C-alpha cells in the first residue's frame, strides 16, 4: 500500500493522470464557492494511492526536506514510482462518482459497494470524490484510509474535500446523501429551509463544473423537494437527470406484500411508490403483481391492503428506529445501489421501478414542476421513460392528491431557493419523514 503527499505546486496533469491510483485530499476550500469557515493554512493537499497486486513497487523516496515538511500521517509522507502499472485492456473508461455526506453511516456502507464493482460492474474503474464538512474532514480521511486498505483494484482515485466545486468537477454521477437531520422541536418548514440552502449550493456547483449529463440521486431529506431545489439551481443540466430516492420505500413495500402472500420477495413486481418520501407516500397495490398476478387477486384482504399495508410501508423507518436505535443506513445504501442499477441495466420486460423525478410532461395528470415518485422503465443507458400502462381507481387517486398537495406546499416553502419569489410556508400537515424520530 502506498500513499503520496503532494505539495500545492504539483501540476493538474499530475493529479489527474489516468494511470495514477490516487487518494486526493483537498482541504483548502474556495471561499467564493463554500460557505463553510476556511481551514487553517497549515493544512496541505495530500494524495494517496493503492498499488495493484501485480505492480512493481519502487523504494519509497522523500518528496522534500524532512525539516520543511508539515505534519503528516505515516505513509502520506512517502511517494512511490507507479510507472510500472500494467493497464487492464478489458476495462471501460474511468467514471467519476461524487458523494456528499461521505463520512456518514449510509456512505460507509455505499462506498465499498461502489469500489468493489458491485454497482457498475467488474470491468468499470471508478474515481470517488467525497464531500464532507469542516467538522467531518478528519472522519473523511479515515474513510479514505479504509478504502485504501481494502485494495479495490477498480478504485483508481479518491478525492476528499469540503468544497462542492472541487468534488463535483467532471462528475458523471452525483449521490447527494448529506443533509442535516431534523432535530427535536424543529418544524418541517425549518428543515426545508436549512437543507434547501445546502442543495441550492450543490445545484450551483453541479451546474458549474459537473458533466453536462451527470445523473443526480438525492438521498438527503426531504429528498423530493431537495431534488427540486437542486435542479432549479442547475439549469445547464437536464431536469430529467435528477432523482429523489424512493427505492427503499419500494423495497419495503415488496417485502410486506411478500410476507402477506407467503412468497419470496422476488415474486413481487410492478411495485410503484407514488409521491413524496414522507408518510403521505402511496405504495400502489393496484398495479403491483405477485407471481404475475394482480396483488388484489392474490391477497383477498383488501382492508389490510388499504390500511395496514400502506401504514406499515409509510412508517417502516420509524419502526426500525425503535428497534435499532438509529435510522436505516445499510438498507438505504442497498436501495441506492438498486436505484443506480435500474438506470444502467435494462428493466425486465413488463416490469418497472420507482424513482422521484421531475413531473413536467407526465401522463398521469399530476401537477407539473415538482419532483414526484412515479413508475419508470430504463433501456440501461442511464435514462428512463415513464410507464403509461398503469390504472387508477378512486382510492389511488385520493391518495395521490394528498401527497401531491404536500409537495406543492413544500415547493411554496422554498420559493426563495428556486428563484420563484418569496417563500410562503403553509404545510397541510407536519408529516414525519420515514426514519425520523
Swiss-Prot record:
Its EC number is 1.1.1.82. The keyword Plastid applies. NAD(+) binds at residue 202. GO terms for molecular function: L-malate dehydrogenase (NADP+) activity. NADP(+) binds at residues 101-107, 195, 219-221. The keyword Disulfide bond applies. GO terms for cellular component: chloroplast. It is found in: Plastid, Chloroplast. Coiled coil: none annotated. One of its GO terms (biological process) is malate metabolic process. The record marks 72, 77 as: Activation of NADP-MDH. Keywords: Chloroplast, Disulfide bond, NADP, Oxidoreductase, Plastid, Transit peptide. It is an enzyme of class 1 (oxidoreductase). Substrate binds at residues 182, 188, 221, 252. Chloroplast NADP-MDH is activated upon illumination. In order to be enzymatically active, disulfides bridges on the protein must be reduced by thioredoxin which receives electrons from ferredoxin and the electron transport system of photosynthesis. It catalyses: (S)-malate + NADP(+) = oxaloacetate + NADPH + H(+). InterPro entries: Lactate/malate_DH_C (IPR022383), Lactate/malate_DH_N (IPR001236), Lactate_DH/Glyco_Ohase_4_C (IPR015955), Malate_DH_AS (IPR001252), Malate_DH_NADP-dep_pln (IPR011273), Malate_DH_type2 (IPR010945), NAD(P)-bd_dom_sf (IPR036291). Belongs to the LDH/MDH superfamily. MDH type 2 family. The chloroplastic, NADP-dependent form is essential for the photosynthesis C4 cycle, which allows plants to circumvent the problem of photorespiration. In C4 plants, NADP-MDH activity acts to convert oxaloacetate to malate in chloroplasts of mesophyll cells for transport to the bundle sheath cells. Homodimer. This is Malate dehydrogenase [NADP], chloroplastic. It comes from Medicago sativa.
Amino acid at each position: 500500500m502506498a500513499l503520496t503527499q503532494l505539495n500545492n505546486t504539483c501540476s493538474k496533469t499530475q493529479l489527474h493522470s489516468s494511470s495514477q491510483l490516487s487518494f486526493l485530499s483537498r482541504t483548502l476550500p474556495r471561499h467564493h464557492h463554500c460557505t463553510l469557515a476556511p481551514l487553517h493554512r497549515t493544512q496541505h493537499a495530500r494524495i494517496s494511492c493503492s498499488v495493484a497486486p501485480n505492480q512493481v513497487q519502487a523504494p519509497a523516496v522523500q518528496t522534500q526536506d524532512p525539516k520543511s515538511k508539515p505534519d503528516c500521517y505515516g505513509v502520506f509522507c512517502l511517494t512511490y514510482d507507479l510507472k510500472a502499472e500494467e493497464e487492464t485492456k478489458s476495462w471501460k473508461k474511468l467514471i467519476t462518482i461524487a458523494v456528499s455526506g461521505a463520512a456518514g453511516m449510509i456512505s460507509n456502507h455505499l462506498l465499498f459497494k461502489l469500489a468493489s464493482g458491485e454497482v457498475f460492474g467488474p470491468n468499470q474503474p471508478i474515481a470517488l470524490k467525497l464531500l464532507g464538512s469542516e467538522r467531518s474532514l478528519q472522519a473523511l480521511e479515515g474513510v479514505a484510509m479504509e478504502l485504501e486498505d481494502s485494495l479495490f483494484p477498480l478504485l483508481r482515485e479518491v478525492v476528499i474535500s469540503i468544497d462542492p466545486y472541487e468534488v463535483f468537477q467532471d462528475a458523471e454521477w452525483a449521490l447527494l446523501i448529506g443533509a442535516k437531520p431534523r432535530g427535536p422541536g424543529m418544524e418541517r418548514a425549518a428543515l426545508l429551509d436549512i437543507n434547501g440552502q445546502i442543495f441550492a449550493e450543490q445545484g450551483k456547483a453541479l451546474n458549474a463544473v459537473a458533466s453536462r449529463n451527470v445523473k443526480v440521486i438525492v438521498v438527503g431529506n426531504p429528498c423530493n423537494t431537495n431534488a427540486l431545489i437542486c435542479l432549479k439551481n442547475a439549469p445547464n443540466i437536464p431536469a430529467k437527470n435528477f432523482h429523489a430516492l424512493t427505492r427503499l420505500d419500494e423495497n419495503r413495500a415488496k417485502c410486506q406484500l411478500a410476507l402477506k402472500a407467503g412468497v419470496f420477495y422476488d415474486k413481487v413486481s410492478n411495485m410503484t411508490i407514488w409521491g413524496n418520501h414522507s408518510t403521505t407516500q402511496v405504495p400502489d397495490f393496484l398495479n403491483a403483481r405477485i407471481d404475475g398476478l394482480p396483488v388484489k387477486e392474490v391477497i383477498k384482504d383488501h382492508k389490510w391492503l388499504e390500511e395496514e399495508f400502506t401504514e406499515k410501508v409509510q412508517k417502516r423507518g420509524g419502526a426500525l428506529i425503535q428497534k435499532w436505535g438509529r435510522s436505516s443506513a445499510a438498507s438505504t445504501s442497498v436501495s441506492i445501489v438498486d436505484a443506480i442499477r435500474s438506470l444502467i441495466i435494462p428493466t425486465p420486460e413488463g416490469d418497472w421501478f420507482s424513482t422521484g423525478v421531475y413531473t413536467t410532461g407526465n401522463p398521469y395528470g399530476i401537477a407539473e414542476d415538482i419532483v414526484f415518485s412515479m413508475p419508470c422503465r430504463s433501456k440501461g443507458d442511464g435514462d428512463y421513460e415513464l410507464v403509461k400502462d398503469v390504472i387508477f381507481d378512486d382510492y389511488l387517486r385520493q391518495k395521490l392528491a394528498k401527497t401531491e398537495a404536500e409537495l406543492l406546499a413544500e415547493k411554496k416553502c422554498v420559493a426563495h431557493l428556486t428563484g420563484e419569489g418569496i417563500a410562503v410556508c403553509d404545510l397541510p400537515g407536519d408529516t414525519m419523514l420515514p426514519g425520523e424520530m
